[in-house]
């Protein structure tokens, strides 16, 4: 379960940011996770609660924005969101699309203080 190591890294980064900002508590952590990032959101939430114990994030809410897979279709010459991230074919023309624009993100976007 690599989500636990990801959760520990999030807690470490956020704790350092809190210390740098001079705040003692973080109330929310905002993440963006792409559909291809290989992270299970529920497992990350569970792991985050464990990793945050005894830290400035102990009571923080983990808010996750799930990012769909967006690819560039050279045939249509446009970016398209894939309805099924396992099929890399344009939903409009049916041609294969290999250039991933979005969907691999794993980003700490923002921290919120009380």
From Swiss-Prot:
Protein species of origin: Chloroflexus aggregans (strain MD-66 / DSM 9485)
Protein name: Hydrogenase maturation factor HypA
Cross-referenced Gene3D superfamilies: 3.30.2320.80
Gene: hypA
InterPro entries: Hydgase_Ni_incorp_HypA/HybF_CS, HypA/HybF
NCBIfam families named in the record: hypA
Binding of Ni(2+), residues: 2
Gene Ontology process terms (BP): protein maturation; protein modification process
Domain of life: Bacteria
């Amino acid at each position: 379960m690599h989500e636990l190591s990801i959760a520990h890294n999030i807690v470490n980064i956020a704790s350092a940011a809190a210390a740098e900002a001079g705040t003692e508590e973080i109330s929310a952590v905002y993440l963006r996770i792409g559909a291809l990032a290989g992270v299970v959101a529920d497992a990350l939430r569970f792991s985050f609660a464990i990793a945050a114990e005894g830290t400035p994030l102990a009571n923080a809410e983990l808010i996750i924005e799930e990012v769909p897979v967006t690819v560039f279709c050279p045939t249509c010459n446009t970016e398209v969101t894939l309805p099924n991230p396992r099929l890399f074919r344009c939903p409009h023309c049916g041609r294969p699309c290999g250039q991933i624009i979005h969907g691999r993100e794993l980003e700490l976007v923002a921290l919120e203080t009380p």
